[in-house]
Regions:
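Catalytic cores of the polymerase beta-like nucleotidyltransferase superfamily
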Residues: 1-474
C-alpha cells in the first residue's frame, strides 16, 4: 500500500497547482524538506515549496504566469521558475542532473524527463523522496523513509559519485547528521574520508554557510565529530582536530578537543529565547565556545615541576580565530565578536584569584562591550572539572562578579541622572546666590526625578517654587 501525504487540507494551493500541471499533461512533485518533515512528523510551517516537474522552464513559466500573483525567472538557467501566491513562494524546477567535472566549482546542468534520474542525483536518500501532486502519493525509490526511521544517512547512488559531482555534499552530510542526530552509513563515511581533499575546490563562502548551519543545529557535536574523524576538518577548520593532540590534565578530559565540545554544549544550554540577550541558536557564542582554546597547541609548555602551561593562549587563540574566519569569508562584525570572546575568556580567573577593584570590573565590562552577555555564558561554561567543590567555587566567584557588575551599572545609571534644572537655573528661579541652599534645592529636584521620573522644566520649576515656599525662605 502506497503512502500518502495529506496535501489537500494542508497545502491546497500546491494541490491546485498540481492539478493545473496535470491538465497541461505534466507531472508535478513536492520535494525537499517539506516531504522529509511530513514523514518525520515534524512538518513545521512552510511558506517555501520546492517542486520538480517534467515540464520545461518555458512551459512552467506559462502555467505559473496564469496561476501566481507574481513570477520570476532568476533561476531559469538552472531550470527553476518561481511564483508567489497567498504569501507563499513556489519554486518549480525541471528534472535535471548536475555534474561537477574535476577541479570545477560549478555544475553543468542538463534537463531531463525522468523523475528517477532527477531524484537519484540528489544528495541523500532522506532528500530524494517526492510527493505527487495533486494526489500526495509518496515516491520513495531509494528507501529514504526507512533511512529516516533508522537514523542513517545514505546517498541514492554510490557516495563516490555523489561527492564527486558536488564535494560540498560531504559538508552537508555532517550538517544533516548534526541536525537530525544521524549516523552516516559506513560507505558514506569511507567516501568522505577518501575524498576529503576535494572539498578544496568548493568556494570558502559555501563551506562557511554549511559550517554555520552545522554549528547552529541541534546536535553540533555529532557533525563536528564527523568532520574530524573523516579528515574534512583538516581542510575547513584545521585548528579543531589539532586540539585532539593536546593533553590538558586540568580538565580531566582525554584532550582539549573533548573539553571544547563540552564547553560548547554547556554554552548552548545557556542560550535564551528570542527576547533574551543570546537568542538560540547563537552562532557567535557557540563558535567562540568551540574555539576558545585553539591557542593551546601553539602555547603549550612543560614546566620543571611536571605541569603544563598555556600562557597567553587566549591572545594567540584570538589571532588564530581571526585568521581562520577571514579565510572562510566571515563578515568583520562576526569575526570581531568571536575573537573578542576568545581573547577575554580567561580574564575572569584573575577576578577569582585576586579580586578586582571597581575600576577593574569596569574595564572588564568596557573590554567586553556588546559581547558581555555572551562572555558571561562562555566563562560559566568553561568549567568542565569533575571536582564539584572547584565547580561550586568558580560558579560562586562568577556570581559575585556579575553582582558587582550590576551594582556598578545601577550606580553609574544613578550618577548619570540629572534633574531638569542645574545650579545656575536654580539660582535664577529662586533669586539666590551660590551657597548651601542651592545644594539643598538641587537635592530636592534630584530626589523628585528619581521618585517620579522626568517632569519637564516647567513642572520642575513650579515644584521647586512650592518647595522654596515651604523650606527655603524659612
Amino acid at each position: 500500500m502506497s503512502q500518502k501525504l495529506d496535501v489537500l487540507s494542508k497545502y491546497p494551493d500546491a494541490v491546485e497547482l498540481g492539478e493545473l500541471y496535470r491538465q497541461a499533461g505534466f507531472d508535478l512533485y513536492l520535494v525537499g524538506g517539506l516531504v522529509r518533515g511530513e514523514l518525520r512528523n515534524t512538518p513545521g510551517e512552510f511558506t517555501d515549496f520546492d517542486m520538480t516537474t517534467n515540464a520545461t522552464p518555458a512551459q512552467s513559466e506559462q502555467i505559473l504566469s496564469a496561476w501566481g500573483e507574481h513570477i520570476w525567472d532568476i533561476g531559469k538557467e538552472y531550470g527553476t521558475i518561481s511564483a508567489r501566491k497567498n504569501g507563499a513562494v513556489y519554486e518549480v524546477t525541471t528534472y535535471r542532473a548536475e555534474v561537477y567535472v574535476a577541479d570545477s566549482r560549478k555544475p553543468t546542468v542538463e534537463f531531463g524527463t525522468d523523475l528517477k534520474a532527477d531524484l537519484i542525483r540528489r544528495d541523500f536518500t532522506i532528500n530524494a523522496m517526492a510527493a505527487a501532486l495533486p494526489s500526495g502519493e509518496i515516491v520513495d525509490l531509494f528507501h529514504g523513509t526507512k533511512d529516516l526511521a533508522e537514523g542513517v544517512l545514505r546517498t541514492p547512488r554510490s557516495p563516490q559519485e555523489s561527492f564527486s559531482e558536488d564535494p560540498l555534499r560531504m559538508m552537508r552530510a555532517a550538517r544533516f547528521a548534526a541536525r537530525f542526530n544521524l549516523t552516516v552509513a559506513p560507505e558514506v563515511f569511507e567516501a568522505m574520508r577518501q575524498m576529503a581533499p576535494r572539498i578544496e575546490i568548493i568556494s570558502a563562502e559555501r563551506v562557511r554557510d554549511e559550517l554555520i548551519k552545522l554549528i547552529c543545529a541541534d546536535y553540533p557535536r555529532v557533525g563536528l565529530n564527523l568532520l574530524v574523524e573523516t579528515g574534512l576538518a583538516g581542510y575547513v577548520l584545521p585548528e579543531l582536530p589539532a586540539l585532539r593532540m593536546e593533553m590538558d590534565p586540568s580538565h580531566r578530559h582525554k584532550d582539549v578537543y573533548e573539553h571544547s565540545l563540552k564547553v560548547m554544549e554547556q554554552a548552548i544550554e545557556k542560550e535564551t529565547d528570542a527576547d533574551g540577550p543570546c537568542p538560540a541558536p547563537d552562532f557567535v557564542l557557540r563558535f567562540a565556545s568551540l574555539l576558545h582554546d585553539i591557542g593551546k597547541p601553539k602555547t603549550r609548555r612543560f614546566e620543571k615541576d611536571g605541569s603544563v602551561s598555556f600562557l597567553q593562549h587566549d591572545v594567540v587563540g584570538a589571532r588564530m580565530v581571526k585568521k581562520r574566519m577571514r579565510a572562510l569569508r566571515f563578515d568583520n562584525d562576526t569575526i570581531k565578536a568571536v575573537a573578542r570572546l576568545v581573547e577575554l575568556h580567561m580574564r575572569f580567573y584573575g577576578y577569582r584569584e585576586a579580586g578586582w577593584t571597581d575600576s577593574a570590573v569596569r574595564r572588564y565590562v568596557r573590554d567586553a562591550g556588546e559581547q558581555l552577555q555572551r562572555l558571561h555564558r562562555l566563562s560559566r561554561s568553561d568549567v568542565t572539572t569533575r571536582n564539584k567543590r572547584m565547580a561550586r567555587s568558580l560558579a560562586q566567584a562568577y556570581d559575585d562578579l556579575e553582582r558587582r557588575i550590576d551594582e556598578l551599572a545601577a550606580q553609574e545609571e544613578l550618577d548619570a541622572m540629572r534633574p531638569e534644572l542645574d545650579g545656575e537655573q536654580i539660582m535664577a528661579v529662586l533669586g539666590i546666590d551660590p551657597g548651601p541652599l542651592v545644594g539643598q534645592a538641587y537635592k530636592f529636584l534630584l530626589n523628585l526625578r528619581l521618585d517620579e521620573g522626568e517632569l519637564g522644566e516647567e513642572e520642575a520649576t513650579r515644584r521647586l517654587l512650592v518647595w522654596w515656599q515651604e523650606h527655603g525662605e524659612s
